[in-house]
């Protein structure tokens, strides 16, 4: 389980998280929605120890992340796959080399084992036999799938997705959504997905949490969020230009 408890985080005078609390049980696909700059990416960076809270704390599998030693944090990160918004591939490396990076750093497999794991991961994202190609030869959607393959090659327990469908056309976005669902169903991973795309949120989420003014405004099932009576939540999910601030 992942648990963020009353997390506060500021950057200078800017308060980003102000009592953010969220629990993600094993097997769940939690989608975090919210306006640009609301702190969604900041929140999940606390899970892998890239940021430390000013107040509050974060637990993963019962371990308090801010208190972990460097070695313990490394071990924790080996269980967490992070899929970046823009794939974050190295252009000078082949697709196979990009996917193998984490495996080589981990040092648990020999070369044939790494090659087999890379091929397996690429097959899972429907990109077989692309190991010798380079990122510049692939479309944006294909590069995102390579980023996902790199994350799952380590066989993580958790997957964190940061805006996985940003910049993609609707058809390619639907492909990425189906892959996220596949990762949960086939690999049994617990996932947290950050997105602005409500179609994607409704497709992949088992629960959805809206981050607003530094804390969770509402968290519920897909239907509970879709039919929310909260004016702030409703304005966001329906894409309305204005809300009744008296009601908010």
Segments and roles (model prediction):
Residues 134-138, 142:
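Conserved ABC ATPase signature
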Residues 159-162:
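Catalytic Walker B motif of ABC-type/P-loop ATPase nucleotide-binding domains
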Residues 153-157:
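A short, proline-enriched helix->beta-strand linker immediately N-terminal to the Walker B motif
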Residues 63-64, 111-129, 181:
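Conserved ABC ATPase "signature" region
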């Amino acid at each position: 389980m992942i648990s963020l408890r009353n997390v506060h985080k500021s950057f200078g005078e800017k308060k980003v998280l102000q009592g953010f609390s969220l629990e993600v049980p094993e097997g769940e696909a939690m989608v975090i929605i919210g306006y640009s700059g609301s702190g969604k990416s900041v929140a999940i960076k606390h899970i892998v120890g890239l940021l430390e809270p000013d107040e509050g704390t974060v637990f993963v599998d019962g371990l308090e992340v801010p208190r972990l030693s460097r070695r313990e944090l490394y071990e924790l990160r080996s269980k967490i796959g992070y899929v970046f918004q823009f794939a974050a591939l190295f252009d000078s490396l082949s697709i196979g080399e990009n996917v193998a990076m984490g495996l080589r750093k981990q040092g648990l497999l020999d070369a044939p084992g790494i090659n087999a794991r890379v091929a397996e991961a690429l097959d899972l994202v429907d990109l077989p036999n692309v190991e010798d190609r380079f990122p510049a030869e692939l479309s944006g959607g294909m590069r995102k799938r390579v980023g996902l393959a790199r994350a799952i090659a380590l066989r993580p327990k958790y997957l964190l997705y940061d805006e996985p469908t940003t910049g993609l056309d609707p058809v390619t976005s639907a492909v990425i959504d189906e892959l996220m669902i596949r990762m949960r169903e086939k690999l049994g991973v617990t996932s947290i997905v950050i997105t602005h795309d409500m179609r994607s949120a409704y497709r992949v989420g088992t629960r959805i949490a809206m981050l607003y003014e530094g804390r969770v405004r509402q968290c519920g099932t897909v239907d509970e969020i879709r039919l929310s009576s909260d004016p702030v939540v409703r304005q966001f999910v329906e894409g309305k230009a204005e809300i009744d601030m008296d009601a908010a």
